[in-house]
Design a protein with these regions (language model features):
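Solvent-exposed interaction surfaces and binding hotspots enriched for charged
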Residues: 1-107
Length: 107
């Protein structure tokens, strides 16, 4: 499966981004990817609310450490896993940077 995952991210300040993430051709479940992305972002937001001493850099560092651990746990050589991580990150980062910010509606 390949294609695009359209995902709306909203910051705590009410700025939204509609990101069109390209999916890897071997993606098994776009809905599963979307659900996990949502759960991870919600977990980060919840944790940050409780820990005001965390900086954006601290959050990015924790995510990188998590990614390194998960990449090491997959059934692939460390170099193959690293190459895949870089490929996936670069594509996702380009998509996120291409998304224009806008004010999210308030209910």
């Amino acid at each position: 499966m390949s294609g695009t995952l359209t995902f709306t991210a909203v910051t705590s300040g009410g700025v939204a981004y509609d990101v069109d993430f390209p999916l890897h051709p071997l993606t098994r479940s776009s809905q599963g990817v979307s659900d996990l992305l949502t759960a991870l972002l919600e977990t980060i937001s919840s944790h940050v609310e409780k820990r005001r001493d965390l900086s954006d850099g601290d959050i990015l560092q924790a995510l990188c450490l998590t990614l390194a651990v998960r990449a090491r746990m997959v059934a692939a050589s460390p170099e193959s896993a690293r190459e895949l991580v870089i490929e996936l990150f670069d594509a996702a980062h380009r998509a996120a940077c291409a998304a224009s910010p806008y004010e999210a509606g308030r209910a």
